[in-house]
Amino acid sequence: AHICRLVLMKLIPGVKEADLAAFGSAISEIQEIVGGHFANEQGGSPWSSSAVGRLANRMRDMGATGIGQSSWGPTGFAFAANQQAAERLYHSLVEEAKADGLEIIIAQGRNAGARIGPA
């Protein structure tokens, strides 16, 4: 029920109002809850990869929000307020990531749905 409340009362309004702080906070909290459910299968950690977990914590400390991991990982993700903030995160963490065998990429959302047409 708590995840449902986060989605309905925080995540969706955050998207609708372009409020990255609200959206990101909801994503992070949902990810913490879900990661906690899998911690026993992941050596006691909410992260499937300790390296991704360390990098995610560093991104959070540097101002990123909406931090989590894909399904069982090891892909981690975070949101930044703008391109400049994303590049600051990238340049601050890329060498640390490489040392842990990780790759950091900057990606943008595609703000339009898919189109289906005749072949």
Set out the residue ranges of the language-model regions.
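Conserved mixed alpha/beta catalytic, RNA-binding, or beta-rich assembly cores of soluble enzyme
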Residues: A1-I3
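Regular secondary-structure segments
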Residues: R5-K16
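Glycine-rich, charge-dense phosphate/pyrophosphate-binding loop(s)
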Residues: V15-A119
